[in-house]
Amino acid sequence: MAKPIPRVGSRKNVRSGSRKNARRIPKGVIHVQASFNNTIVTVTDVRGRVISWSSAGTCGFRGTRRGTPFAAQTAAGNAIRAVVDQGMQRAEVMIKGPGLGRDAALRAIRRSGILLSFVRDVTPMPHNGCRPPKKRRV
């Protein structure tokens, strides 16, 4: 005789509510990675656990528009809006990369109302390491 097929999605297997618990984070670190093609903003707590993140691509910008300052400003605003709701008041800012969105993202962070402890440029600089790629001929 055939065994009865267990029902998938029965009530006892379904989790109610959100899996993430709403933490109160008074202090955090905002990482801005600005490349020429995109800007990624990640907000972590002081231990480095990611609380919120956003990028110009997830904000709806596609192609070359992802590298623009306006796209970086929108991405920073989206990432910070989520953590302000969780109670973040103070933050440190780490900016990495040579992209156009560096200053625009920092301006959006300053306007959000979060007190900034410091702003640090953590762009990796080689001490004459790897050979750079050849120059483009257009």
Swiss-Prot record:
Record GO biological process: translation
Main location class: plastid
GO cellular component terms, semicolon-separated: chloroplast; ribonucleoprotein complex; ribosome
Alphabetized GO MF terms: rRNA binding; structural constituent of ribosome
Subcellular location: Plastid, Chloroplast
Gene3D superfamilies (alphabetical): Ribosomal protein S11
Biased composition annotated in UniProt, kind: Basic residues: 9-25
Top-level taxon of the source organism: Eukaryota
Keywords on record: Chloroplast, Plastid, Ribonucleoprotein, Ribosomal protein, RNA-binding, rRNA-binding
Region (Disordered): 1-25
UniProt xrefs under PANTHER family: 40S RIBOSOMAL PROTEIN S14/30S RIBOSOMAL PROTEIN S11
HAMAP family linked: Ribosomal_uS11
NCBIfam families cross-referenced by the UniProt entry: PRK05309.1, uS11_bact
Assembly and binders: Part of the 30S ribosomal subunit.
Similarity field: Belongs to the universal ribosomal protein uS11 family.
Name of this chain's protein: Small ribosomal subunit protein uS11c
Species of origin: Carica papaya
